[in-house]
Amino acid sequence: MFKRSLFILLLLAASLVKAEIIEVDSLNKIKQDFKENYNKNYVPQDLLVVTVLDEFLFKSLVPIGEQIDKDIYLTLTPLLRNINKNSKAIYIDQLILTNDSYKKELQESDFPNFVNEMSNSKIPIIAVNDGFTGNFNNIPKFEIWFADYLKKNFNIDFSNSFPNNNYIIFNNLDSFANTYPVFYKGILTSNNISKAEMMLNFLIQVGFMPKAFIIISNNIELLKSMEFQLNSYSSNILFIGYHYNNKNTPENKDAAYYTKIINDLISQINKIKRNNPPLKTNKIKDKNPYDKNQ
């Protein structure tokens, strides 16, 4: 009787999925884990890799906190407060991204190769970003522009992972400025919705639950939130969160350099325009309600 009970306990213990959050400062450790673990223990279709692009994809235009000289930061504080008081400050990252006058430099020069390696290995890989969908200044649909921009300028393409679900509008979630979160060509644009909530919604909508969910983000709270969301939905998914913390300190410019950039941003923020008319309820499968030509 004792042996039988022990055997049952061992089976239960083996069935439990262990979650883990791992600290990394580059993609090298992650690539090594794929080579030594994931590629050996899982078939590609049982994995899902999620890259959270915010503050991971590009180097910061205006370094903050420990990345910048304390005296310079104190000089800039009043200007930064002016930005934060502006109701359009939520669009600042999107403004920087879409403005050609601001240089964009990858934090990880090998990131395009990493994405391509996953795709070529048939491992599903998607991205999440904190942008807003629909019209933004002179861009008709930001989510479409962003996917095209990454592919054209950096050879980053997430579109191969879910080709049968290349455009999903999450109108079951809350709208913001007459728009909804969107999945377009492998990129989830959160549109002011919790990223963890949106990612789970995506998995449910496409009917895909991986055996191992591998996510890369510089936001530890997001990793914990996603772990909680997955665990609440199913205890059979292995959660691996890579907390990306690049400790390479960028070269500091002087206060005048940053002051000019911030003043320019304030001016640009005040000029931001969005024009998104209310969307009609769309029940036609695969039709894109953002596309006026349909």
Curated annotation (Swiss-Prot):
InterPro entries referenced in this protein's UniProt entry, alphabetically: DUF2608 (IPR022565)
Keyword Signal: yes
Signal peptide: 1-19
Protein keywords: Signal
The keyword Signal is annotated on this UniProt entry: yes
Pfam families, A to Z: DUF2608
Protein name: Uncharacterized protein RF_0480
